C-alpha cells in the first residue's frame, strides 16, 4: 500500500504531465451553442464544428442528427461530404508532385491528359488550379443533356464529355471563372503522374502523415462510409435525403470529419506535410495574362473579414454545406461541416470566429455586415419603393440574368430562396450568401444592379424591358436544336404562353420569356439568334458555361 509521501509524489507527477500534454477540446461554450441552436434538435440535421487556436483544438462539438432515420447524433467524428472544400486537398496533392519534380505547374495539361481537345491555346496545370482555364463546367454541360443532378458520373463519362467540347468560355489565363471540370482533371492528372488514384495518393501523402484517419476521397459511390452523416434538404415541413452519387473526385468527393479537418488546419501553421516551401506555394494567388492577380490560390480563397485577412473555401452539394475559415495572422481556424441544405456554413463559421476573436475583429459595418441581418442593421422600405427595383437584369459579358421580384415585405431573387434585405434605400444584403446588391440609375436612365461578392468582386447588370410575346412569335422558335458536343437534341415547343424544352424521357423544361428573344430556365438563359431574319441557333448561358450553341435542324 503506497505511503502518503508516495501519493503526493504521484499527484505532482500527474499534474506536471497534465500541464505538458495538449489540452482537450472543450465541448461546451454557450455562445457557440446559441449559434447552432436552430440545428440542435433530434428531428433536424445539423453541423459539426471544430475550432483551432494557435495549434490546439480548443472546441469541437456536434449539433443535430447525422441520421434522422436511425436517431444518430452528429459528433466531431461524424463523416461529411466536404464538397468543394475537397479542392484544396486536390491542389495540395498536385503541388506535392510538382515539389518532387514529377510535373511542372506550367505543363500543358494535354501532356498528361490528351483527351482534352486542342483548342489552339495551351491550358496549363496552373490554369486548372486557379480556375483560369476557360474550360466549361461539367455540371452545366450535364444539366443540358438531362443527366440527373444526383446521378452517378464516372471518369469515363466525364472524359467523353470533355473530349467532345469544341470551344472554351474564354482564352486560358484571360479570366477567372470557377470550373469544377478543371479539378476533376487534376485528380486524373494525379493518377497518371503518380500511378495512384487521388484517393490512394492522398491517403499516403496527406491523410496518413497528418493522422487524418477518418478522411478519404470516395471514388465509388456505392462504397460504405463509416460514421457518415447523411445529407438532407427541406421538403415542406419535413426533410428528404439529398446525397451526391458521383464517382469522379477532385472537385469534391472528400469525406472528412471536424476532428480531422482541425488537423489539416494546423498543417497550415506547422507545415508537417509539405514543409515551408509548399505551405507558401499553396497560398500563391493566381495571375491573369493581364498581370492582375486573383483571390483564388490552390483551392483556397484570399479575402478579409471585419478588418482581418482570411483564407477560406466553402462547399455545397446535395444537402451538404461546408466551410474552412482561417485567420492566418491569429493562427486561428473554424471548421463547419453541415448535413442540412438550409445551413450557411460560411456565416456560421464567421459567427464562431467572432466569439473567439472578439475585439481583435473590427466592428461590423452596418451596410455590409457578414452576419445575419438584424433589426439594427436593416431598414424598412414600402412596397412601392421595393417595386421600383423589380424586373429582369442582364449582364451581357457573362450572359447571366438576375430576376428580382417583390416577395412579402422585401425583394427576392426569383425562383430561389435568396431574399434581398434592405440596409439602405438602395443597398440590400442577400440572405444565405455573402453578397450585397446595390441599385442605381444608369447613364441612359435605365436601372443598374451592382452585385458585390464576398471578396469584393463586382458584376453589373442592366434592367431589360419585358418582351411582347404571342402565340405567333413563340411558334417561330419551335423546332429541333442539335448539339454535337453533348450528343443531344432539344425539341422546342410552345406551351401555355411559354416555350418548353423536350429531351426524351427526362422531364420537360419551361422557358419563360424575359426580354427580346431571350428566355430563362433552370438550365440557364436561352437566347435565339437570327441570321437574315431566320432563327438559326440558340445560345445558352449557364453561369459557368457561356456562349454554348445548339444549331437549328433544317426543316424538310
Question: What residues fall within each predicted segment?
Answer:
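Short, conserved catalytic-motif segment at the N-terminal edge
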Residues: 27-82, 102-107, 111, 160-167, ...
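Bacterial N-terminal signal peptides
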Residues: 10-19
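Bacterial N-terminal signal peptides that target proteins for export
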Residues: 1-11
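Active-site SXXK
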Residues: 33-36, 49, 55, 79-106, ...
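Short, well-ordered beta-strand elements
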Residues: 58, 312, 323-340, 447-452, ...
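Short, surface-exposed loop or secondary-structure junction motifs
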Residues: 67-68, 120-328
Amino acid at each position: 500500500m503506497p505511503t502518503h509521501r508516495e501519493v503526493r509524489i504521484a499527484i505532482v507527477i500527474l499534474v506536471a504531465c497534465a500541464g505538458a500534454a495538449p489540452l482537450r477540446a472543450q465541448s461546451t461554450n454557450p455562445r457557440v451553442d446559441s449559434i447552432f441552436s436552430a440545428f440542435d434538435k433530434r428531428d433536424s440535421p445539423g453541423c459539426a464544428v471544430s475550432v483551432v487556436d494557435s495549434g490546439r483544438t480548443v472546441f469541437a462539438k456536434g449539433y443535430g442528427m447525422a441520421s434522422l432515420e436511425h436517431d444518430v447524433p452528429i459528433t466531431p467524428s461524424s463523416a461529411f461530404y466536404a464538397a468543394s472544400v475537397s479542392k484544396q486537398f486536390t491542389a495540395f496533392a498536385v503541388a506535392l508532385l510538382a515539389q518532387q519534380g514529377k510535373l511542372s505547374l506550367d505543363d500543358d495539361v494535354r501532356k498528361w491528359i490528351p483527351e482534352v481537345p486542342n483548342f489552339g491555346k495551351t491550358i496549363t496545370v496552373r490554369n486548372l488550379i486557379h480556375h483560369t482555364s476557360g474550360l466549361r463546367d461539367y455540371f452545366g454541360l450535364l444539366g443540358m443533356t438531362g443527366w440527373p443532378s444526383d446521378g452517378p458520373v464516372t471518369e469515363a463519362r466525364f472524359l467523353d464529355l470533355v473530349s467532345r467540347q469544341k470551344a472554351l468560355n474564354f482564352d486560358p489565363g484571360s479570366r477567372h471563372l470557377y470550373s469544377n471540370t478543371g479539378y476533376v482533371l487534376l485528380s486524373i492528372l494525379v493518377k497518371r503522374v503518380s500511378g495512384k488514384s487521388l484517393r490512394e495518393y492522398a491517403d499516403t501523402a496527406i491523410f496518413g502523415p497528418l493522422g487524418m484517419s477518418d478522411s478519404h476521397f470516395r471514388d465509388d459511390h456505392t462504397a460504405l462510409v463509416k460514421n457518415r452523416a447523411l445529407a438532407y434538404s427541406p421538403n415542406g415541413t419535413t426533410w428528404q435525403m439529398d446525397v451526391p452519387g458521383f464517382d469522379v473526385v477532385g472537385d469534391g468527393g472528400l469525406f472528412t470529419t471536424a476532428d480531422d479537418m482541425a488537423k489539416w488546419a494546423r498543417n497550415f501553421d506547422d507545415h508537417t506535410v509539405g514543409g515551408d516551401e509548399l505551405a507558401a506555394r499553396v497560398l500563391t494567388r493566381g495571375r491573369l495574362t493581364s498581370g492582375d492577380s486573383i483571390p483564388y490560390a490552390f483551392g483556397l480563397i484570399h479575402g478579409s473579414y471585419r478588418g482581418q485577412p482570411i483564407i477560406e473555401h466553402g462547399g455545397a452539394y446535395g444537402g451538404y454545406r461546408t466551410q474552412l475559415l482561417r485567420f492566418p495572422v491569429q493562427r486561428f481556424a473554424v471548421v463547419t461541416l453541415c448535413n442540412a441544405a438550409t445551413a450557411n456554413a460560411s456565416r456560421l463559421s464567421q459567427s464562431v470566429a467572432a466569439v473567439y476573436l472578439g475585439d481583435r475583429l473590427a466592428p461590423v459595418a452596418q451596410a455590409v455586415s457578414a452576419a445575419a441581418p438584424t433589426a439594427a442593421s436593416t431598414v424598412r422600405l414600402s412596397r412601392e419603393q421595393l417595386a421600383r427595383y423589380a424586373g429582369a437584369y442582364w449582364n451581357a459579358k457573362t450572359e447571366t440574368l438576375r430576376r428580382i421580384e417583390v416577395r412579402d415585405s422585401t425583394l427576392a431573387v426569383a425562383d430561389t430562396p435568396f431574399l434581398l434585405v434592405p440596409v439602405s434605400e438602395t443597398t440590400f444584403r442577400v440572405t444565405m450568401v455573402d453578397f450585397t446588391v446595390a441599385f442605381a440609375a444608369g447613364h441612359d436612365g435605365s436601372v443598374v444592379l451592382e452585385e458585390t461578392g464576398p471578396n469584393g468582386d463586382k458584376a453589373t447588370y442592366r434592367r431589360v424591358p419585358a418582351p411582347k410575346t404571342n402565340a405567333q412569335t413563340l411558334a417561330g422558335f419551335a423546332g429541333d436544336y442539335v448539339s454535337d458536343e453533348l450528343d443531344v437534341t432539344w425539341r422546342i415547343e410552345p406551351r401555355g404562353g411559354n416555350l418548353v424544352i423536350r429531351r426524351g424521357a427526362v422531364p420537360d423544361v419551361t422557358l419563360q420569356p424575359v426580354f427580346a428573344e431571350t428566355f430563362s430556365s433552370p438550365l440557364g438563359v436561352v437566347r435565339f439568334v437570327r441570321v437574315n431574319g431566320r432563327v438559326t441557333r440558340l445560345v445558352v448561358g449557364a453561369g459557368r458555361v457561356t456562349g454554348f450553341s445548339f444549331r437549328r435542324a433544317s426543316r424538310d
